[in-house]
Amino acid sequence: MSVLKEYRTVSEVVGPLMIVDQVAGVHYNELVDITLHNGERRKGQVLEVQGDKAMVQLFEGSTGINLAKTKVRFTGHPLELAVSEDMVGRIFDGMGHPIDGGPELIPEKYLDIDGQAINPVARDYPDEFIQTGISAIDHLNTLVRGQKLPVFSGSGLPHNELAAQIARQATVLNSDDNFAVVFAAMGITFEEAEFFMNDLRETGAIDRSVLFINLANDPAIERIATPRIALTTAEYLAYEKGMHVLVIMTDMTNYCEALREVSAARREVPGRRGYPGYLYTNLSTLYERAGRLIGKKGSVTQIPILTMPEDDITHPIPDLTGYITEGQIILSQELYKNGFRPPINVLPSLSRLKDKGSGEGKTRQDHAATMNQLFAAYAQGKQAKELAVVLGESALSETDKLYVAFTNRFEEEYINQGLYTNRSIEESLDLGWELLSILPRTELKRIKDDMLDRYLPKADTTMTKVFVAND
């Protein structure tokens, strides 16, 4: 059996890859133990087997490997993660080793980090609301349990701060079920890692979180394994411990860059912009691990965060992510420059399952109606502001000026809630009604009269300030 054999037939090392000759009985995805000439031990994984040659990806890098003196042993099983409920509240490196100074975990079991394929028939439909405390998400782009809703960011935007805000504020309403956050950070700097660890510790959110950190100077292969390790942890907590788990993965762009690096080392034919042709398939093996299962109490919800290179939403990473996931939250450079935090651009953002997680019994009966009216009013106000820039304020009607006033207050009060303000869904809904009261009742055509009678506050026209676009 290959598990009993030790090979000294390493013929080539290229970047993070190693070629072992004269192998027998070796299988794809098999875990590999590597012993260097100085006794140092490293781990690897079989990427490909052709005849009697095996290509092994190295998790700890290839520095210091002596071809003639390196010993290789194939273990006969895939890379597995030791899991335990005691992982909650702990901090790990990208390979699942504790780095917080705490005790070693006593594993309850070992799980393959690639998980198991979920039969579509076994999936339950996501329809339960998750409150993030952020109005632009909870009210306008509702997140539900089992959904995968990515955040599309740009260079220099505060996506790390947004990720930390969601991690500490997210909660399940009207439920006694346990809620946990699994946070996977890939390719981040030491300063960013310190920010995440300190923020979760200082706010107490670490007590319900599991944090995996892969630094920018860690091997690219480890970066590929980190999200799989995080998702394996989430599936264990969800399906075996009955917890509702929110998985936040940042930055998926760094993950895809690692895929491209390994693909280039394998001399594969590149696809769009040099990324491997199987990028879509590879991303789907991560994103499709979100969901709910019939007969299982827990759920896995995903918020992958990625930075769009050159703010290009047609770039392969956001483009392919959008095909797999159920919407997107888009951050805006313009809103960020104007000082709005978080700078969520609500008009191009979308949650395809928002209708399933809102309404009476989940949030409130006026949720959908106010959401649609806010979208319509904000879009019309943006159009009025653009018209004022071209033709001047005098070209605006009185109604247009009210839409401009609404748009400015919407951005300043609703979107610009701050990175440390936790709003309940009721507070977001009430604020939405307050802003809609700026407009004449006749303009609120997407809300039924009985709902207007119940929720719409009387507008104080003496206090309404009209801001023009070029103020």
UniProtKB/Swiss-Prot annotation:
UniProt xrefs under Pfam families: ATP-synt_ab, ATP-synt_ab_N, ATP-synt_VA_C
Top-level taxonomic group: Bacteria
Keywords: ATP synthesis, Hydrogen ion transport, Ion transport, Transport
UniProt-listed InterPro entries: ATP-synt_VA_C, ATPase_a/bsu_AS, ATPase_F1/V1/A1_a/bsu_N, ATPase_F1/V1/A1_a/bsu_nucl-bd, P-loop_NTPase, V-ATPase_su_B/beta
Annotated family: Belongs to the ATPase alpha/beta chains family.
PANTHER family linked: V-TYPE PROTON ATPASE SUBUNIT B
Protein purpose: Produces ATP from ADP in the presence of a proton gradient across the membrane. The V-type beta chain is a regulatory subunit.
NCBIfam families, A to Z: PRK04196.1
Stated name of the protein: V-type ATP synthase beta chain
Record gene name: atpB
